[in-house]
Structures are given as structure tokens and as C-alpha cells.
Swiss-Prot record:
Keywords: Cell inner membrane, Cell membrane, Membrane. Could be involved in insertion of integral membrane proteins into the membrane. The keyword Protein biosynthesis does not apply. This is Putative membrane protein insertion efficiency factor. Coiled coil: none annotated. It is found in: Cell inner membrane. The keyword Transcription regulation does not apply. Belongs to the UPF0161 family. InterPro entries: Membr_insert_effic_factor_YidD. It is a peripheral membrane protein. One of its GO terms (cellular component) is plasma membrane. It comes from Rickettsia peacockii (strain Rustic).
Amino acid sequence: MTRILLLLLRFYQYFISPLLGNNCRFHLTCSEYAKEAISMHGSIKGLWFTFKRIIKCQPFCDGGYDTVPISIKNSKPLNKKI
């Protein structure tokens, strides 16, 4: 499922997005955000993060730099014992 979603996103980025123009209010475009979210968190959770991001893409949101949240199991400890 993850591979299919990533292929669909790649298709969108190469063939559909250039026709629509560059009008994203966020630094990572929604399609880049979706690719990163799906790669990091899998298809279900990645789609959930993507859905929440697309909901934010509206005139009342300032936009800016928005990254995919890192899950606790994927993060590395900040303090290492020596």
C-alpha cells in the first residue's frame, strides 16, 4: 500500500503539479509532506498526517515551515551514557 501511495504522489508531482503552478503556502509542499509522512509512519498514519496538513492549507493559515512529526519509536535518545 505504501509503495502505491508513493507512486501516486510521484505521478502527481511530475505530471499534475506543474500544470497547477507553485502556489503552496508551506515550505514543504503538501505532496512532499505526504511522501515524507507516508515513508516515516506508513500508509495509514501518513495519510492521517497528510489529511491534517491539507486541512491547514486555507486562507486563514499563515503557512510557513511545517515538518512531519517524528514518532517516539523512530527518534534517537538525546542523552547517551558514556
